[in-house]
Amino acid sequence: MKPLSLKGHDRALTRVRINRDGDLLFSAGKDKSPCVWYMENGERIGTYDGHNGVIWDIDVSWDTRHFCSASGDVFVKLWNCETGDVINSVSTPTAARSISLSYSGNLIAFTTIKMTQNVASLFVYDIRDGSQMSGENQPTFRKSLQTQANSCVWTHLDDTVCVGNEKGNVHQYDIRKGDDIVNFNDEAHKFQINDMQMSTDESFLITASKDKTARLFDARTLDCLKTYKAERPVNSAAISPIRDHVILGGGEEAMKVTQTTAASGHFEAKLYHLVFEEEFARFKGHFGPINTLAFHPGGNCVVSGGEDGYVRIQEFDTDYLKFDYDF
């Protein structure tokens, strides 16, 4: 199928998200306005204007009522999805690097970077508590991190948050139990973790790392179950909601791209079998590394965002949907 190529950002993409209904696509980049698009035809509905810096991460609630963004302008904003109005702005000590909305859509978890006297931290805010969101009261949960975390995700409903840090470790915190780590895997990756995503049923967690691998973990115990090897650093990985497949995206780092040909940069998205760890398909299209990937909830298409500033919606053809792996 011919992919849709969407141009709405002046600079590199940092995150694409699809709502649970699968009809809206949200994208954020290193420019200051996240965009929202129709998945069906790639028409841009509008932008969320209010930030003054790079948008590092975004997330959307299950009912598509709320949308949140983490930015380098030291603000985390909660938006009304439909109108594009800012509901709350939370001031952060340093730039916010990653953000995740909980299963219920009531709690926001985000991580901040280490800068000068400020240590990297994990925060959890309750969006129902106006005094918390306005900064009058302390957040629901706060934890100083020894190593900066570039990704965070809710793992068990509204109870536990996982962070992936620059040393390649995965740590899990239970917000009901104070600031102790519940689970950890300090041998998850050799280099920094760039992205973490959950499976639809919340039983698996996939991580993408600079060490040229993506790994599948048990979301409860953080045991490593599978390793998917690539030839270049992996920036993003996602699990198919309907098949035993995972998709990896990455490529040669942006600053090294001038020294490589497009073919050796490995700028394709790669499909692997979840169980057998074998690559069986690739998508070309981006002329730079892929920074972010998301599967459609129906499992029939995948969205990628690249360093080239384009969002691509790649629909799977019937060959893929009928494809069965030979044992």
UniProtKB/Swiss-Prot annotation:
Cystine bridges: none
Gene3D superfamilies associated with the record: YVTN repeat-like/Quinoprotein amine dehydrogenase
WD repeat start-end pairs: 8-49, 51-91, 144-183, 188-227, 229-268, 285-324
Designated name of the protein: Eukaryotic translation initiation factor 3 subunit I
Assembly, per entry: Component of the eukaryotic translation initiation factor 3 (eIF-3) complex.
GO terms for biological process, alphabetical: formation of cytoplasmic translation initiation complex
Xref: HAMAP family: eIF3i (MF_03008)
Family (UniProt): Belongs to the eIF-3 subunit I family.
GO molecular function, one term: RNA binding
UniProt-annotated location(s): Cytoplasm
Chain's role: Component of the eukaryotic translation initiation factor 3 (eIF-3) complex, which is involved in protein synthesis of a specialized repertoire of mRNAs and, together with other initiation factors, stimulates binding of mRNA and methionyl-tRNAi to the 40S ribosome. The eIF-3 complex specifically targets and initiates translation of a subset of mRNAs involved in cell proliferation.
GO CC terms of this entry: eukaryotic 43S preinitiation complex; eukaryotic 48S preinitiation complex; eukaryotic translation initiation factor 3 complex, eIF3m
Keyword annotations from UniProtKB, A to Z: Cytoplasm, Initiation factor, Protein biosynthesis, Repeat, WD repeat
